[in-house]
Amino acid sequence: MYINSGYHNHSLIDFKDKSRPLIVGSCGTYRLSSHQKLPTYRPRGRLDFQIIYIAAGRAHFHFDNADDDTIVTAGNIVLYRPKEFQKYEYYGIDKTEVYWVHFTGSDVKNILRNYGFPNDQHIFHVGTSLEYERIFKRIILELQRCQDLSLIHISEPTRHLRI
């Protein structure tokens, strides 16, 4: 299994911050091949937003309850909003590769709405692109270098993720 990630102020704790329009809290990637299973279970969700981009393979999501299983394939993103139930798994047999980013801010809801993300939807088809992977890797690197990611850094690349 390959893991690469970066965290705002090197903190693994989720946070809510309305001091700026958009603040990236963390970003990373997982690539499973031999690792059997990588589960995530957050019954009360998180304080921030999360986007998961499935770059390869597939992932299993349980949006409304732990028993429902929705398979999301490469070329899609999943959007979680604050305090939403989160349960999902990646399996090595699926050769899953995902990129994820957690973010908060005073204008996040408007930014998402302006880019075509309605409030009542979790899954968005965006297609696969090496450009998406490059954008996520750039965010990871900036977080690892302790650079502050502001709206300017994020808004331009997210235009490529627009549905």
Where does each model-flagged region fall?
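Short, solvent-exposed positions on alpha-helices
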Residues: T70, D148-I152
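A short, N-terminal "cap"/entry segment at the start of jelly-roll beta-barrel domains
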Residues: M1-I23, E142
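Short, charged, low-hydrophobicity "junction" segments
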Residues: M1-H8, V108-I111, R134-R138
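Regular secondary-structure segments
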Residues: A55, E133-Q147
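Alpha-helix N-cap/helix-start motif at coil-to-helix transitions, marked by capping-box chemistry
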Residues: K18-P21, H102, V126-E133
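Single conserved hydrophobic/aromatic residue that forms the stacking wall/gate
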Residues: I152-I163
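N-terminal regulatory/effector-sensing and dimerization cores
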Residues: S19, S26-N119
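Aromatic/histidine-rich interaction motifs
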Residues: N114-K137
